[in-house]
């Protein structure tokens, strides 16, 4: 299996048992945050164009129902046998960034004709000029990262009111695709100087040809754009008050437990985005005792009931029928299978104690832990006010914020506030 590298670094972490007992923090394990992406005003000008009549459906762009039901192995076997040994890389990174594999396959066909006319050159640079990287896995991960960064940056900009759209035909997925496809033009200011920007029509047509989806599935009216959910990070606080977070934007308070077996206590670090930078703060890292590589590690359990997608040898997603899902990364010895229904507290494997197992498709981590994320309909969602069992999350002001006055987990059963690195007993869902 091909493995590529992402930058790594240690984060300062440690133990703090409660508001009343905070001690000095040693260094522990986590993942390296990616650099935060900021929208350029030229990108906003580029997408406000009349050629985009209806926005691309966010639900088709994200790794939601359509993606989870897509038989990638069968599609590759029938249509692109040269990609058989790339299947896990595609599912892993598409799942990690939560973008429909159909999106990346469509872009590959547009850029290199890898599916219809495969060549060695196309296999090495399947996404062509969309990425400066060399190699299949490198370009795959890079372009998915670009799409994810643009998607969530656009949602954040809309929540903050920075760039009010001049057309209803642009949503987060349309912006992400348009900004990616026009990246070179934006860098050269060609779009602003009169050169026509690339619209979404070629992408949508190629998507139709490959997968047979209809316009009704691919496009959406402006009244049903699946709007983003408010976050409470520092960058959002002045724009969307926490009072605006409604019950409909949160999973049921009795739905989730912590992602380890009931009856045990683990520890969590501060909330962060799925990539460690930007918005929303949908994830936490958890471990029994934050050991070194090679030390014993323990069972990961489903936080709720739902259907399993095994995304790779080290990553699993569980999706409930109500659209809420949880993602589990850096796993090993996975015991569940694709399509299996699991109940809450079902053991699905362990978090890996071997670096190569934890990073089965590349990446970096400085020690064993589970990277746990919350999603709704494929979109990463803030953990703010989410109940993980008896603990209600307050995400803090920024990624990996460990200050207990900002990031904490309120124990509603015992009326106390728990800080990062405090032992959290898993009694199941409320």
Segment roles from a protein language model:
Residues 258, 264-268, 298-310, 342-345:
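Generic structural motif
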Residues 247-251, 264-302:
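Short glycine/threonine/proline-enriched tight-turn/helix- or strand-capping micro-motif at secondary-structure
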């Amino acid at each position: 299996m091909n493995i590529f590298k992402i930058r790594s670094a240690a984060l300062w972490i440690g133990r703090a048992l409660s508001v009343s007992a905070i001690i000095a923090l040693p260094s522990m394990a986590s993942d390296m945050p990616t650099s935060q992406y900021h929208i350029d005003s030229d990108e906003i000008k580029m997408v406000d164009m009349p050629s985009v009549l209806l926005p691309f459906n966010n639900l088709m762009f994200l790794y939601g129902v359509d993606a989870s039901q897509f038989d990638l192995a069968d599609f590759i076997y029938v249509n692109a046998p040269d990609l058989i040994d790339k299947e896990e890389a595609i599912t892993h990174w598409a799942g990690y960034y939560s973008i429909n594999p159909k999106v990346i396959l469509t872009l590959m066909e547009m850029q290199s004709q890898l599916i219809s006319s495969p060549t060695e050159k196309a296999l090495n640079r399947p996404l062509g000029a969309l990425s400066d990287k060399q190699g299949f896995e490198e370009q795959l991960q890079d372009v998915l990262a670009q799409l994810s960064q643009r998607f969530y940056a656009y949602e954040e900009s809309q929540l903050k009111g920075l760039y009010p759209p001049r057309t209803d035909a642009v949503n987060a997925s349309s912006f992400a695709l348009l900004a990616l496809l026009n990246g070179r033009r934006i860098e050269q200011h060609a779009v602003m100087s009169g050169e026509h920007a690339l619209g979404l029509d070629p992408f949508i047509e190629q998507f139709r040809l490959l997968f047979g989806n209809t316009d009704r599935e691919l496009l959406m009216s402006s009244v049903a754009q699946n709007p983003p959910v408010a976050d409470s990070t520092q960058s959002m606080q002045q724009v969307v008050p926490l009072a605006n977070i409604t019950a409909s934007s949160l999973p049921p308070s009795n739905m989730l437990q912590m992602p380890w077996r009931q009856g045990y206590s683990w520890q969590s670090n501060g909330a962060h985005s799925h990539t460690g930078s930007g918005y929303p703060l949908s994830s936490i890292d958890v471990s029994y005792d934050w050991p070194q590589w090679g030390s014993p590690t323990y069972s990961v359990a489903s936080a709720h009931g739902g259907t399993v997608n095994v995304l790779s040898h080290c990553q699993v997603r569980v999706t409930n029928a109500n659209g809420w899902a949880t993602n589990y990364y850096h796993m090993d010895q996975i015991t569940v299978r694709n399509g299996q229904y699991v109940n809450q507290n079902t053991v699905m494997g362990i978090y890996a104690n071997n670096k190569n197992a934890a990073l089965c498709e590349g990446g970096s981590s400085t020690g064993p832990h589970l990277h746990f994320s919350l999603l709704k309909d494929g979109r990463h969602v803030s953990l703010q006010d989410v109940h993980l069992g008896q603990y209600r999350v307050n995400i803090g002001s920024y990624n990996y914020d460990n200050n207990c006055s900002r990031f904490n987990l309120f124990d509603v059963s015992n009326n106390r506030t728990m800080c990062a690195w405090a032992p959290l007993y898993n009694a199941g869902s409320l």
